[in-house]
Amino acid sequence: MGQEKLYTEKELSWLSFNERVLQEAADKSNPLIERMRFLGIYSNNLDEFYKVRFADLKRRILINEEQGSAVTSRHLLKKIQSKVVKADQEFDGLYNDLLLEMARNQIFLVNERQISENQQTWLKQYFKQHLRQHITPILINHDTNLVQFLKDDYTYLAVEIIRGQDIAYALLEIPSDKIPRFVNLPPEAPRRRKPMILLDNILRFCLDEIFKGFFDYDALNAYSMKMTRDAEYDLVTEMESSLLELMSSSLKQRLTAEPVRFVYQRDMPDEMVELLRNKLGISNDDSVIAGGRYHNFKDFINFPNVGKSNLVNRPMPRLRHVWFDKFRNGFDAIREQDVLLYYPYHTFEHVLELLRQASFDPSVLAIKINIYRVAKDSRIIDSMIHAAHNGKKVTVVVELQARFDEEANIHWAKSLTAAGVHVIFSAPGLKIHAKLFLISRLENDEIVRYAHIGTGNFNEKTARIYTDYSLLTADARITNEVRRVFNFIENPYRPVTFDNLMVSPQNSRLILYQLIDQEIIHAQAGESAGITLKINNLVDKGLVDRLYSASSAGVKIRLLVRGMCSLIPNMPGISDNIQVTSIVDRFLEHDRVYVFENKGDKLVYLSSADWMTRNIDYRIEVAVSLLDPKLKQRVLDILEILFNDTVKARYIDKELSNRYVPRGNRRKVRAQIAIYDYLKALEQPEQ
């Protein structure tokens, strides 16, 4: 069988994942406002796809053209464009349907032609008080270089300034980074109506306020547009430049990086479309999409809570881990037994509080932590600064190459350094994606270490919407190896060995191959054999091939893959024993769990790494084997709930059909709700 039939192209698989997000917007069992927010998530995801995946494909086409072999990549490009256009049409239909449903619930998202005289007066005043100072027209003439100063993924209004037979053009940036995209209008009778207007439409309504007195014109017409740039870097390793300087210049480069997508309002005049395409240097390989009146739907992720309470998800208050309530401080609790937290069901407050305590505890000598993506107002960063002020030896490993968070991380690195924190940057080309901290504490004249190993970032915001595990432990078998990981980060080319941790790029591929091969041996011997994986992405061909081999040997394999999946299940003789499902629901499934049957004595790993080549071979990632039988069983219980979902689970198949898993005669199980109930029962205080 040819290779092209053994794997799904990762780009098409990624788009299929985003179609599952669109399914959530279409799902009438979801609350109305949550459905509108899923449209925002879909749009945000698609922006990232073009910045990264599509841009990467464009580069491959350029490379292949030089080698005379770009046909396959161009064919994939056409498939992508066709798939996106089809999904966008569905998106537009869903948006219009949701507007009608909103109106039935007395929520009205109006345009500039649907407002009353009182609202018109109010809007002009609002424009003068809040908006005008943020609006400066960009006049388009022969010398205008739009590529240089148009911002990535901002929405602009392209304005026709018409006087007789003459037409001039200008652009207005919609300042949604400074003013809320949704503006509540004064209500009209009946008072229960809740009218809102988009910032875009306020600008359309106030065009005269912007141009009058500066231009002579007979008419002004405005059309929306946006541009997406290539988000990858040209990271050349200049030994005389520090990584911080290199990243800063890379960020500047992104501001002038090549456009990869141009989206414009469908009724924009052809002459204007051509002018903008030429000014932006949009090639035939770039994605040019005629869209609706509004772009940057990602702002709809924050669609306001208006109307009745049943229009949004019912609250799920985050759970406290009752074990911490039994002790004076977090260290006593963790020293007594390992603690496993599962967000967003558990509160992230336990981790924040532990680091706060460490910042002033006289017994704490040193803290080491790595940050990849932290919250905008990070309490973790504050704790590290306070710890340094309190005389602790604080080391923070800052990943400057965390895509889309580089600017924030550069800022944090400078703030930490100014506070006396020892800041370390990763080596160029070796991202640190592990989620670790290590606290060294003097207890009875001995140093006791406390470690955190997680699947997600130290981020208060994402911990409310991403599912992730945190293992907190004082077990020396693990803490000593976490210490070795930090030593490896500081000296990345020095050999180091691990027994209880799987560490990329050191040993992950080797260990994973060995674990899969061991299951093959067990299956061939007629013993209990199986593999269960929960990951975000599965696209590494070496690991996919190993899973195919295991399936062919009779190993039962269950995969829960949220995003990209190159593996094709149910191919006769190749993947008959592999089942792949995906869950998209109110929380983003983000944790990575690997389970190997091991003849009944299951091995359970929590990991920061997806099964992608970059994560296995080119990043620092950490997976930990759970040693506590109770915690191991808890993770296995949660996995069983996920694999028994009958509401939000879809099959991943060769056709990328996203068919829902049929319920049949099984009971209704919505996994995320069931997991919350399961953990809530465990966390009830003892009577």
UniProtKB/Swiss-Prot annotation:
SUPFAM superfamilies, per the entry: Phospholipase D/nuclease (SSF56024), PHP14-like (SSF143724), PPK N-terminal domain-like (SSF140356)
E.C. number: 2.7.4.1
The protein's name: Polyphosphate kinase
Required cofactor(s): Mg(2+)
Enzyme class per UniProt: transferase
Catalysed reaction equations from the record: [phosphate](n) + ATP = [phosphate](n+1) + ADP
Mod. after translation: An intermediate of this reaction is the autophosphorylated ppk in which a phosphate is covalently linked to a histidine residue through a N-P bond.
Cross-referenced Pfam families: PP_kinase, PP_kinase_C, PP_kinase_C_1, PP_kinase_N
Keywords annotated in UniProt: ATP-binding, Kinase, Magnesium, Metal-binding, Nucleotide-binding, Phosphoprotein, Transferase
NCBIfam families, per database record: poly_P_kin (TIGR03705), PRK05443.1-1 (NF003917)
Entry's Gene Ontology molecular function annotations: ATP binding; metal ion binding; polyphosphate kinase activity
